[in-house]
Amino acid sequence: MKSGIGEATGILIVHPPTAKACEPPGGPARLAGALRARGVACRLWDANQEGQLALLGAAALQRDGEGGGGDTWTRRAVRHREENLAGLRSPELYAHPDRYCRAVRDANRLLWAAARPSGVRLSLADYEDSRLSPVRSADLLTAAAAPGANPFYPWFAGRLAEILEETPVSHVGFSLNYLSQALTAFAMIGHIRRAYPALGIVLGGGLVTSWMRSPGWQDPFAGLVDAMIAGPGEAPLLALFGKTPAAGFDRPDFDGFPLADYLSPGLVLPYSASIGCWWRRCSFCPERAEGTRYRPVPPGQAIADLCALTGELRPALIHLLDNALSPALLTALAAEPPGAPWYGFARITPELADRDFCRRLKDSGCVMLKLGLESGDGEVLKALGKGIDPALAAGVLENLAEAGIATYVYLLFGTPAETPGAALRTLEFTAAHARTIGFLNLAIFNLPAYGPETEGLDTGEFYAGDLPLYRRFAHPKGWNRGEIRRFLEREFKREPAIAAILRRDPPFFTSNHAPFLAMAAAHRSADPGRSG
C-alpha cells in the first residue's frame, strides 16, 4: 500500500459499469461476508446497476427536453421506459417472448442514446469506446486522466460524493471482471485519485487476475492504483485491515445491494461453491494457465449457506456461479434442495446419464443447466480433453429434457483440432437433438494469450495492446475465422431446427434470463389454456 494513506478504517467495494444488471455481483458479496465477519466496515456499491438506471433516466429526460425529438425507435423507448423496466421485473412479461424482447431492446436503445454523444457504444451487456481500448494500459490511463469524458461521469461523481459522506472509508476497492468494465472503472479511479487523494485504491477481480498472472507482467498502474490483487481477495483485504482470514469460506453478505431493483423478475441470488474448476483437464483451460487451484466449499456448507440465504432473502432464482458444478455438489443439491429454483454450469458427466438422478435434480429446483458441449464431433472432443463423446452428450440431453430441465448449450467453432467436416458433424448433431436443446451459444474460438497449447501454432497479435487476453493464430488445418463465420451464417444458422432454437435466445441478457423464459414456457405447457 502507498504510504501516507493513513489508518485502514473501512472499505467501499465497487462493482463498476458495464455488465448485465440482472443480479447482484457475487464476488463483492463474498468479500463483504469475510470482512464483516471480522468487524471490518465494508460498504457495497453496485455502480453498474445504479449507473445503468441513471443513464436510462437521463436518456428519457434528454429526449423530453428535445420536445420528443430523435428517431421513432428512441421516442418509443422513452415513452415506454417505465413500463418496460417494470415488465422486466415482473414474471408475466417472460410468458410473452415477443413482448419481452421488445422491452429489452427498447431499454438497450435508451442506453445507446445516452452514451452516443460520448463516442461510446453502450448496451445492457457491453461498453465499446470508439477511441480507447481496455486492452491498452495507456488507454486505461487516459480514461483515468479524463474521467469527464466517460458517459457515466455526471452520475458517478455526484453519487460517490453522497456515499462517502454517508460512509467515511479509508479505501475504495474495485472488482473488475470484464473488459466491458475496465474503461469506466479507470475513469472512476482517476476521479477518486484527484477528488479524494487520501483514499487508498485497491483493484482486483477476474480480469485483473488474468493481467497479473500473464508472463512478463509489469504493473503499468503504479501511482494510480495502490494495490492490485490476483486471485481471491479475502486474505489480502483482511491483511490490509490487520485481520486474519479463516481457513474456510465465509457466507456471502448482500446487505447494501439494491436487491429489489435489478432487471429480473425477482431477486437472482448468486453463489459460488468453488474457486477454480474440478475437471481442469480441458485444453486451453484458463484455470490451469493462471495457476488457479481448485478449492470447493464443502457441499454441506454450500447447502447450509444456500438454505440460510434463501430463507433470508427469498430469491426467485439461485445462480450457481461455479466454472462447473461438481458431481459432489450436484448430489448434495439433489439430496437437500436449497429452497428456490436454481441453475448453473455443469459438465456433461456420467452422473447426468442417470435418468433418475436428473429427475432428482429437477425435484430439487434445477430449472436449467448450462452445458459446455463445444463440439458434436468425437475427435474434436477428444483433442480438447473434454472427457466426453457425442453418445454421452446425446443421452444427457435426452435425460435432462425428459426431466424438464432446460439446457443452454455452448458450441465452440474453430479450435485447432476442428476441420470443416467436424463443424458439419456438429451441425448434424445439433439438428438431430434440437428437441432436447433449449438455448444455444455459438462462439468462434479465441486462442488464449499464453499457455502450453499455444506452442507450435503460428501466432500474432489479436489486437494491439499490452494487456492481451488472446492471440491471433493461423489455423493448422486452414479453418480460419472468415470461413467459420460464413459456415455459421450460411449453413449452421439456416438449419430450420437450429434457427428455431436461436430465436429463443434472450437478447443481451442471454443465459441470465433464459431460466425465466424456460420456467414461463414450462408453465404454459402445463397450462395449455394460458395465452402465450
Enumerate the predicted regions with their spans.
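Conserved SAM/AdoMet-binding glycine-rich loop
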Residues: L12-T18, A198, S210, I303-T407, ...
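Canonical Radical SAM [4Fe-4S] cluster-binding loop centered on the CxxxCxxC motif
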Residues: L263-G300
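Glycine-rich beta-alpha loop elements in corrinoid/cobalamin-binding modules
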Residues: G10, T18-A58, Q62, E128-D250, ...
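Conserved Radical SAM active-site core
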Residues: E50-G57, R63-V169, P215-A222, E287-P341, ...
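Conserved, mostly hydrophobic/aromatic
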Residues: L35, C277, A302, L320, ...
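C-terminal accessory regions of radical SAM enzymes
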Residues: V14, T18, C22, R30, ...
